[in-house]
Amino acid sequence: MLRIGIVAHPRRKAMAEKLFADVDADVIRYDNSKRRVGCEANHRRVWADLVQIAKPGDWILCLEDDAVPVPCFRTSVTAALKHAPSPVVSLYLGQGRPSQWLPRMKQAVARADREDASWIVGDATIHGVGIAILGPDLVEEMLHKTVLYKGPIDQRMSMWLRQFQMRAAYTFPSLVDHADVETVIEQHPDGRPRERGRVAWRFGNRTKWSNRRVPL
């Protein structure tokens, strides 16, 4: 079974509730605007909520409120995850940032196109837009380990992956796009403004998924 949670900000309530309905999500958590828990802490709350309702063997998916899902989302994601080459899956590989990853992304996307690969596999979760983890035990391990790290949730998860020599598998094409709207984060950890252009390299679905993969 696929369990889905939405990480939401009050300024995007309408967007978040539409996403909640579109993907038939199980959980939604708002980062209260008066007593903010913070973006990273809100991610952790959603993961923890999903652990409480998930069973062994379930995929647990955390979506940010600006995720744009493909049609027939649950069916599409379930079909892809049957062939996942890793227990950690990102549904989004985006252009625009971070700049240091762009050359490698471009090469991987070109190779995936040539080889008709369903997956691009690397040692980092570059984006937090949509991440799925197999089983509540692994999610609990992630929560336990990443609390020791600093930085945004995607960077913390990347450190966790590298520490335990795990990989993140990106669906190709991406099963969620990124609604390239104004950020709700007042100050990003790197101090840099977010420019437009943060959309998926490829967005859509496949008629048939496989375990064919290329490296990132």
Residue ranges and their predicted role:
Residues 1-63, 67-216:
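An acidic/histidine-cluster motif and surrounding catalytic segment
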